[in-house]
Amino acid sequence: LLDGILESGDLARIHLQVYAAELGEGDYTASLNILSGDTIAQIITINLIIDGGELPPILPRYDISSSESGIINLPNDTDPIFFNVANRYTHVISENGDFIPILIQNNFSVDQISHVRNVLESYLVDVEDGEWGSNKAMISNAIGATNAILLLLNDEDEYENPNVWSLMDSGVHGQDLLSTEVFPEGSIEYMNSSHRNATYEEVLHFVHNYGIQIANPSMQNEI
């Protein structure tokens, strides 16, 4: 339920976001009702048509609570489309309890994985009194709803890996990040600034593509 009050002469933009991941094929209708004691009520009809089509594979939510690091090995019964690409898994919880999955190849250390996950979480934390960041719930919820995956790959050779291409061609959305680009604070490479650290950049691409662009059009327009 969306409600609010506009004073006379005020202007507000309302962005409607629809999650269709669990909706079947068909026609759907909703309405936006604008009520006022001083004018005629306005009803704006919203129509949504979902066409049939092949759904992309979806990575199930795995329980990571048994792992001290929050990182687990992928179960052997994982869909081969994912299991042929990565061997470990973790996730970040969105505001509405959905999850944002992270798939991991074997060259990543636990410290590197934790660093990437912490960076993602930091982007989704509210910033009090910030112009755009005071409420990021819709952004984290949008990422979870798209089923997008943060894919941690060993190195550039993985761009020639046919299993990685099969995953992308299946319709799975995501953002890659290489182990050769991740240097946690305190590591030798970080302290010496001897290598390019792309963690913040690539994770921000992930948040932007699957969160900000979907859930916050006003912020996107400013960008």
Feature annotation, model-predicted:
Residues 1-54:
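Feature for long, exposed domains in two main contexts
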Residues 7-17, 42, 60-64, 68, ...:
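Surface-exposed charge patches in extracellular/virion surface proteins
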Residues 19, 36, 65, 72-76, ...:
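Alpha-helix initiation/capping motif
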Residues 28-31, 81-85, 103, 129-134:
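Short amphipathic alpha-helical surface micro-motifs
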Residues 35, 84-91, 134-140:
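Intrinsically disordered, low-complexity boundary segments flanking structured domains
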Residues 42-43, 57-61, 76, 206, ...:
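Generic low-complexity segments that are intrinsically disordered, proline-rich and/or Lys/Arg-biased
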Residues 54-96:
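N-terminal low-complexity, Pro/Thr/Ser-rich intrinsically disordered segments
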Residues 97-223:
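Acidic/His-rich structured neighborhood in mature extracellular/periplasmic domains
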